[in-house]
Regions:
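Generic structural signal for well-ordered alpha-helical scaffold segments
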Residues: 69, 73-84, 104
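Short Gly/Pro-enriched loop/turn and capping motifs at secondary-structure junctions
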Residues: 98-101, 109
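Active-site signature of alpha/beta-hydrolase-fold catalytic machinery across serine-
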Residues: 12, 102-106
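Acidic, low-complexity terminal tails and accessory targeting/binding regions
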Residues: 28-39, 81-89, 105-154
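Generic beta-sheet signal
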Residues: 87-97
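Short glycine/proline- and acidic residue-enriched helix-loop micro-motifs
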Residues: 48-67
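Short beta-strand scaffold positions
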Residues: 1, 70, 94-95
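Phosphate-coordination/substrate-recognition cap region in phosphate-metabolizing enzymes
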Residues: 1-46
Length: 154
């Protein structure tokens, strides 16, 4: 994501790398809801529908859940296909929680709803993509939270 919180995090975690910044892995465009809390929007009927997962509702001047999911999935599939084609076996994506939760809900095994993949800032997941499984079923194995809690406590 080109947003500062992602580019700065990437520089801290991987100072020797020259990351490729991909705009289509940005967080959902919340339009006029950006910067407002759920409490601020509590009386907004569209916000309540959006929060309940209605894919047709979008924030004013923003992006619907369906459009957001379509955008990030198209980009993610392109990235995975490129990694498989080049034989790349390790890669990192530094992006936002909403992007991570949505991608894992769409492609992750075990299957879970987006909110079940929530994590604290600075955390993520390690996944394994097996080319044959990906090409057949478009799924990936989610196998650990990173960094592990013990890494932080040391």
């Amino acid at each position: 994501s080109p947003l500062k919180r992602c580019t700065q995090t990437c520089k801290i975690l991987y100072p020797e790398q020259n990351p490729l910044v991909i705009a289509n892995l940005s967080e959902c465009n919340f339009g006029e809801w950006e910067g407002k809390t759920a409490n601020d929007l509590n009386e907004d009927e569209d916000f309540q529908k959006w929060l309940a997962g209605d894919p047709s509702v979008k924030p004013p001047r923003g992006e619907s859940n369906a459009d957001f999911t379509r955008r990030i999935c198209k980009m993610f599939e392109s990235i995975v296909e490129g990694l498989i084609k080049t034989g790349t076996t390790e890669s990192v994506i530094v992006t936002h929680g909403g992007v991570i939760m949505t991608l894992l809900a769409v492609y992750g095994m075990p299957q879970a709803k987006p909110f079940e993949w929530v994590m604290d800032n600075g955390f993520g997941y390690s996944v394994r993509i097996t080319p044959q499984l990906w090409q057949r079923d478009k799924i990936m194995e989610v196998f650990s939270v990173i960094p592990e809690k013990k890494d932080i406590e040391d």
